[in-house]
Amino acid sequence: MNRRNFVKQQLAVSAVAALGPLGMYAGSSSRDAQAEKQQAGFNLKYAPHLGMFRHHAGDNPIDQLKFMADQGFTAFEDNGMKHRDKSLQEKMARTMEQNQIEMGVFVAHEISWSKPNLTSGDQDLREKFLKEIKESVEVAKRVNAKWVTVVPGFEDLRLDIQFQTAHVVESLKRAAEILEPHGIVMVLEPLNFMNHPGLFLKESPQAYQICKSVDSPSCKILFDI
């Protein structure tokens, strides 16, 4: 069976993570990679992340990106991109450009998984968040990203949900002011309470309400279902 067709069929049947053996990976020129990518013909812009193909392409991020391109992928996401060395970010950006891979989301700030931050209304925590958003603008420019993930963090059980929402909206409005001039969009990710108990943003309707309140083209929903 053709290796490339095998990847495509397995992705449609189950998930990328369930791919069977693909044989030994051999690098190819950008032109050959693009021709094979077009032949693969995915109908959707699937975006794998680093580590998914390390058993086929090795641990080097650049080799993994080239492998993704050879399999026909045209997008890539990397939650940890913000914390990678600048030189690696630049190399990854060049590799994606050469292989016509679009950079997807990366996480724009430190997510507070267990303590209230944006929900609390604490000014110092808000300024820390905004500083990280400004830093992420530079990263986004470096890697040609247009989307960054934002998670408002842990809920503040001392405050009514409406006060928490007002605090989050105010922080996001200020973040949107930073992002808008650069055409960058923060996408709010609701996370289910089973896997992420205690987080403030749990449901899509809640995210919709917040986005309507922020009222900015730089604030949308990451509808991860």
Model-identified regions with their sequence ranges:
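N-terminal pre-domain/capping segments
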Residues: N2-K146, K173, E180, S216-L222
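Short amphipathic alpha-helical leader/targeting segments
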Residues: G20-P21, I62, F154, Q162, ...
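Residues at structural and domain junctions
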Residues: Q34, D78, K115, F154, ...
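Acidic/histidine-rich catalytic cores of soluble enzymes
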Residues: A75-F76, V169-I225
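Amphipathic, soluble alpha/beta structural segments
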Residues: Q100, R158-I161, V187, L222
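Alpha-helix N-cap and loop-to-helix initiation/capping positions
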Residues: S120-K131, L159-E170, N195-Q206
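Active-site groove signature of glycoside hydrolases
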Residues: A140-L159, V185-F193
